[in-house]
Amino acid sequence: MPHDRKNSSRRAWAALCAAVLAVSGALVGVAAPASAVPATIPLTITNDSGRGPIYLYVLGERDGVAGWADAGGTFHPWPGGVGPVPVPAPDASIAGPGPGQSVTIRLPKLSGRVYYSYGQKMTFQIVLDGRLVQPAVQNDSDPNRNILFNWTEYTLNDGGLWINSTQVDHWSAPYQVGVQRADGQVLSTGMLKPNGYEAFYTALESAGWGGLVQRAPDGSRLRALNPSHGIDVGKISSASIDSYVTEVWNSYRTRDMCVTPFSHEPGTQFRGRVDGDWFRFRNGSGQEVAAFKKPDASSVYGCHKDLQAPNDHVVGPIARTLCAALVRTTALTNPNQPDANSAGFYQDARTNVYAKLAHQQMANGKAYAFAFDDVGAHESLVHDGNPQAAYIKLDPFTGTATPIANGGSTEQPGTPGGLPAGTGALRIGSTLCLDVPWADPTDTNQVQLATCSGNAAQQWTRGTDGTVRALGKCLDVARSGTADGTAVWIYTCNGTGAQKWTYDSATKALRNPQSGKCLDAQGGAPLRDGQKVQLWTCNQTEAQRWTL
């Protein structure tokens, strides 16, 4: 947690900065009691890709020691006694599921990756007394260059399981990840829209970024490199992002950027202004606390080098936020960062097209398309502090995927039905409820999350007609919209489809049948007081789990 600071003289200064959302945690969390999480949990891998054979690898670090885990979850350190010349690593592969099949292994407490390859085993090497040489397929000489593979990142420790689907290094074979909670429900992420895998490549090539695409000797697509790698090997031009960065630097010579990196500390803010080639940030006392040289394209796409983010509570959070604003090309349009509204992301013609398309093709809009995509909680990550099981589902390359559901099956849990009649709070998370701001029944007042209080603004009557009412008004999808991100507000009851809702007791989703989408906390986890509510593609995440 950031160090406490005396805020009495800083509050007036901080009020000049608009309130914005914060960075979320990535793959590190606050530890719960050690007894909460066992030494291993089951990991079920389901192969819906139609391809095989599949080879699995569980690789990572424990207590600073690198190694691999077998199917039973036993950790094996890599051999020592290795010098600076890489040597082949022991075969750590685990036989994966055949097409249409599943296998379950044990996932141990590690911080690392689960790799999976299609058709042939991968090649790993070790160096310098047991350090793993990870695949680096941006180099044509890498032994894994012509192998189709992908991986998920995970951390399992006493604080729970963090697992994500990642595109930080490349876009390749589609997959989902999930975690089962103690109540039996499964949170999942990573599912693509129908035909989203090929749609990504088509759009990337049409935008002139086809140099990132790597093909197998037979001409089939293997992956698209993340521009953080592509820029370093000359696969894309730096001209566009260089132009954008120059304009940003010039813009902030005469105005300030306000960075509010922590939602739980809205008073912790930093103001930055450009001086020469340096973007200099000050705290509330006017003291300079961080400075960043005008970054080159590699620094922006990789969020490193000139934008290096140390693991501290000042420079690192500022660097993360600044890099996210540059990658998403929101720095010019919004001086208050991080930007809370994803609708404004990637709108500049000079934007990171790779990241834009990765988010566009995700069913829930969330991706890990660059290193700090968790700024503002836009990353494809699920977490639970008491995980019962984990899931990876290898999805089809064409057509429509099905979401991970209870037990890791491909069937949706529960059957969406009617709306149970009754009156009471609509709870989400442990302490929050659906709320009419200021108990104001004016039409178009967008609903929000607020700490549960039991007042009239949080008492919702669920009718047999499918309506949800509070303060004499109906819960309504703004202007009968169907797009992700459409606001949900209260409005005079009118009997239209914009005011009809169903409830799935298994997934705890409140669904608007007219749009086919679910009631969603804007921006996802971490859930927080004041968070607006919207319509979004149903995804079984924490942001859509409502308790009647």
Curated annotation (Swiss-Prot):
Gene Ontology MF: a single term: glucan endo-1,3-beta-D-glucosidase activity
Cellular component, GO annotation: periplasmic space
UniProt domain GH64: residue ranges: 38-396
The keyword Hydrolase belongs to this UniProt entry's keyword annotation: yes
Chief location of this protein within or outside the cell: periplasm
Catalytic function, reaction form: Hydrolysis of (1->3)-beta-D-glucosidic linkages in (1->3)-beta-D-glucans
Entry superkingdom: Bacteria
EC number assigned by the record: 3.2.1.39
Catalytic residues (positions): 153, 169
Signal peptide as annotated in the record: 1-36
One Pfam family recorded for the sequence: Ricin_B_lectin
Keywords, in A-Z order: Cell wall biogenesis/degradation, Glycosidase, Hydrolase, Lectin, Periplasm, Signal
Function text: Lysis of cellular walls containing beta-1,3-glucans. Implicated in the defense against fungal pathogens.
Protein name: Glucan endo-1,3-beta-glucosidase
Organism: Arthrobacter sp. (strain YCWD3)
